[in-house]
Amino acid sequence: MPCEEVVEMLAVAGLDFVLVDCEHGPADVLALRHHLALADAHGMAVLVRPGEGEHVLAQRALDQGAQGVVAPHVESAADAEALVRALRYPPRGARGFATYSRAGRFGTVTADGHRAAADDRTLVIAMLESPAAIRDAGAILAVDGVDGYLVGVADLGASRSPDDPSVADLLAAVRADPTTAGAVRCDLALGDTAAALADGAQVVVHNLTHVMMQAFRALRA
């Protein structure tokens, strides 16, 4: 939602991070830049979800200070490798290097310091949004430079055929898969954050529209 005050309110409320959706949400590059600047001023981390294959937007978000990227529709190890090439500095990737950005503290850090900080703090999350991606989760998460996964349940449900397992079964399968055990698990929670964490999630995301609509409905007499 392209409203800078919302980002500021989330920071003041004490949330750990905000995920800015540039795939389905209406935020453009200018709004994203404002979100990142406000979050940085409050010391709150920002993750950005670009559109499918929008690696340049993701790179610009990282240059502007985003701490991570949640990349949609990562279907295979090859997709994951392309993602890492775009988002990681050499030698792990091929991202263009600049230190005069917000992420480089406007040229006040050394090149080596900026590279080390980017490598240490940049979180790369692959969204698994089809039965094929769920089946290949182990190979996707084995790619060096991919830190974790978020199952996109809406697209997963829309893309499955009648012969595929249910969304609940696919979710259970990827969470039980031993090849995903070392990856950061991100969950889109529709309810209690504590319940998602207790179930094994390390990062929990809430949909702002859902949160606001629930609050608005609760106001009705």
Say what each PLM segment does.
Residues 1-46, 51-53, 124, 143-146:
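Conserved N-terminal beta1-alpha1 strand-loop-helix module at the mouth
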Residues 15-16, 42-46, 66-67, 119-124, ...:
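Short, well-ordered coil/turn segments that N-cap beta-strands
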Residues 29-63, 85-92, 97, 116-119, ...:
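Alpha-helix-loop-beta-strand connector modules within alpha/beta enzyme cores
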Residues 35, 39, 77-93, 162-163, ...:
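C-terminal helical cap(s) of enzyme catalytic domains, especially alpha/beta-barrels
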Residues 54, 98-105, 122, 128-134, ...:
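C-terminal alpha-helical cap/extension of soluble enzyme domains
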